[in-house]
């Protein structure tokens, strides 16, 4: 897992305007990576696309949507020519478009694999939202397709580019917390009826696939280890009709090779909760809220030092900007992005294990 920590540090440097290798810097100074945004849902329209407005190295050059009117409206806002508006029926046409370097997949989970694989086959790099896919097999197929096509694949774990998260990893790497003994984390909210996330055919699962994955991924990176034991439980409490196809609550525990343990929960039936807490042999650290789009706050009590209380000063769309720019830098410098397809696949396999109980 050491490579991922180096990538966190590199991402932090990129956010500060540094960290580009010489060859990449020359290319980035003269061009931007052209993204084709696939799917005009909430995360695309409210977060990723606005981030490109302040990005140094990324821009929206094409749009794929099943709603022509919405696509035309967004195209006008982002300077996308009419010839670069696609439907899902003519998606393969992106292959011959030199304006498109990469795709950003902001679709429901069950559509990630198909449109990522087709993009790779069209010669485009892929930045795909988490979770990587709806199943382990689909995720593996995505990774295989991108490797076969020699295209970059990055999974959009935006929190890897969030300042409080990067600061937490830095404190751990510097030994400020000592040995990690235990972690607890939770992320959940009360979901509205009718959300596509409540449909198994679209989501692949419930809150674990949607927001619990943040807790899982954070624990792996906070420890720098892969769990050797994992146990999960799921339940439905609210019998109001929302949870006919997916679970309402999931809790799971993990044990790591060092002996560190983790306890995590995720829900679609409770008020908003979002945090992770790390208990170390020398200090305690908590980030709360941890996984929201902005407003993260890190607190730490380190023996012999003044308490740390750091609210995030870089607000949304900052993490999306750094994420888009990091992927562009990796494409231009021919470096492996972090987190890549292999990283997304690990989380998919662990979530499958949690569901198995």
Question: Could you say what each language-model-derived stretch is?
Answer:
Residues 2-3, 7-29, 102, 329-357:
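C-terminal helix-rich "cap/oligomerization" subdomain common to oxidoreductases
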Residues 101-102, 108-109, 113-160, 175:
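Beta-strand-loop-alpha-helix segment that lines the small-molecule cofactor/substrate pocket
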Residues 217-294, 321-335, 352-353:
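Contiguous beta-strand/loop segments that form the cofactor/metal-binding neighborhood of enzyme cores
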Residues 83-89:
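Conserved SAM-binding strand-loop segment of SAM-dependent methyltransferases
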Residues 11-79:
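N-terminal Rossmann-like dinucleotide-binding module
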Residues 43, 152, 159-243:
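Predominantly a Rossmann-like dinucleotide-binding segment in NAD(P)-dependent oxidoreductases
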Residues 37, 87, 128, 153-155, ...:
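Hydrophobic residues in well-ordered beta-strands that form the structural core
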């Amino acid at each position: 897992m050491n490579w991922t920590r180096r990538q966190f540090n590199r991402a932090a440097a990129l956010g500060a305007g540094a960290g580009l290798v010489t060859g990449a810097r020359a290319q980035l100074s003269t061009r931007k990576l052209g993204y084709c945004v696939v799917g005009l849902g909430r995360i695309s329209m409210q977060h990723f696309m606005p981030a490109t407005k302040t990005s140094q190295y990324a821009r929206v050059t094409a749009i794929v949507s099943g709603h022509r009117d919405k696509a035309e409206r967004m195209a006008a806002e982002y300077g996308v020519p009419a010839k670069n508006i696609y439907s899902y029926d003519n998606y393969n046409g992106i292959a011959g478009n030199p304006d498109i370097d990469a795709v950003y997949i902001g679709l429901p989970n069950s559509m990630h694999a198909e449109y990522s694989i087709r993009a790779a086959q069209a010669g485009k790099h892929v930045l795909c939202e988490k979770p990587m896919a709806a199943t382990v097999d689909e995720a593996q197929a995505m990774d295989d397709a991108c490797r076969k096509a020699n295209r970059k694949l990055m999974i959009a774990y935006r929190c890897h580019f969030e300042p409080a998260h990067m600061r937490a990893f830095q404190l751990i790497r510097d030994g400020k917390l000592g040995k990690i003994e235990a972690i607890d984390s939770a992320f959940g909210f009360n979901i509205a009826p009718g959300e596509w996330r409540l449909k198994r055919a679209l989501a692949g699962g419930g809150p674990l696939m949607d927001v619990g994955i943040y807790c899982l991924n954070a624990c792996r990176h906070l420890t720098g280890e892969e769990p050797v034991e994992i146990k999960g439980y799921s339940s439905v409490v609210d019998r109001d009709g929302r949870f006919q196809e997916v679970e309402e609550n999931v809790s799971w525990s993990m044990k790591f090779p060092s002996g560190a343990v983790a306890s995590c929960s995720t829900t679609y039936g409770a008020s908003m909760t979002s945090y992770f807490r790390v208990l170390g042999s020398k200090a305690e650290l908590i980030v709360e809220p941890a996984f929201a789009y902005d407003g993260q706050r890190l607190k730490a009590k380190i023996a012999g030092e003044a308490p740390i209380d750091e609210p995030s000063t870089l607000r949304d769309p900052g993490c999306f900007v750094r994420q888009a720019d990091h992927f562009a830098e990796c494409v231009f410098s021919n470096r492996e992005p972090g987190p890549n397809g292999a990283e997304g696949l690990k989380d998919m396999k662990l979530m499958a294990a949690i569901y198995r109980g």
